[in-house]
Amino acid sequence: SDKEKLWGLGEKGIIFEPFQSRIYTHSNLFSHVVGQVDYDNFGVSGVEKYFDKELKNNKLINTPLELTLDSNIQYLIHKELNQALVTFDATGAGAVLMNVENGDILSLVSLPDFNINLRNNLKDTKYTNKITKGVYELGSIFKTFTVALALDNNLVKPQTVLKNIPRSVRCSKYEISDIKDFPKNLSVEDILIRSSNIGTLLIAKKIGELKYKKFLEDANLLKTPEIELEEVGNPIKFNWNKCKLETVSYGHGITTTPLQAVTVYAAIANGGKMITPNIVKNKNKKKNIRLISERTSESINKILRKVVTTDEGTAKLADIHGYYVGGKTGTSQNYKDHNQNLNTFISIFPSNKPKYVLLVMLEDPKVAKNLVYDYKGMKIKAFRNEAGWNSVYVAGKIIKKIGPILAINNKEFRHQ
């Protein structure tokens, strides 16, 4: 061995001292969650830092700190996201899978990641935990919140038709429009299915600024997220000036973390109760606060299913047989660099009785010119760059892979 060779030199100045070092068997797989310790075994990131005192407490040495994450699911999602970086030439990606009933996070992946066995000082922002610390304008993901709030206040019903919807709306010095032409008359349900900006902002005007602000506060979208990690982001503060209600209604001019957005989707899916996301098992749960009614939750879940199943929907590639996927897409510009897209898809499944919510996001994905999509038995190419053609596609592949594992682990899900 190298030690024996050095010892054989007979140099008195060579001394061997034993030392302890933490070795992580999964290297990159849980890098943003587990985090790192430094050479003195002090936690410097992730769970290692958040629970540094507990992990060093000799009285707790025999008490394991057990996480909610599933290694098999984490591996599969990590693999699909890495493939997505190549397929869509994206600069980054992220995903989080959460149990909608209790907030347990089964998987959390942020790319690029790093080998936590290498004690590097990772200051480059590309290694930021995109799910918990990344702060973004998430775009049309917010349209679900707008429709849910309007339904909950009995201002509209899913089949309420908004007539003579204009092609564009002038608000102060801005002109707001849709990316394509829609019929002049659309039901509330169709507005969400087709993802109409104009239709959504007209619904928001019925709600009003005060009620919308209260919803955002109740949904914890305007404050630092709660999670057992040091790496959390602060949504950028803003003033409710002219046009803010209109733009916030479809997810522009407001920032939040993906973790917060997926937590609100969990509440909408689970019957309307807010939950606290967590990565540590058997944590004392906070009392759930009602965000929307069960009736509203049921209505939204049905609409989100149609976003996936109807020809007009924006998430058709997520219609994986047997899993009753519902969800909403979001295609937005990076608020720091308007030349880059952020494409997001938040899915719930099974939508008839939701158990899980999955967020998939891709940073600056490009058109996959050589990719052949399998859509309703047809092989097609689509030279398009919206979330429906990348983030949705990736989410569908993930659900197809992890679905059997979740079905095995959850008997109730298996019989849906």
Model-derived features: positions:
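Amphipathic, well-packed alpha-helical segments that form the structural scaffold of globular domains
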Residues: 34, 38, 52, 56, ...
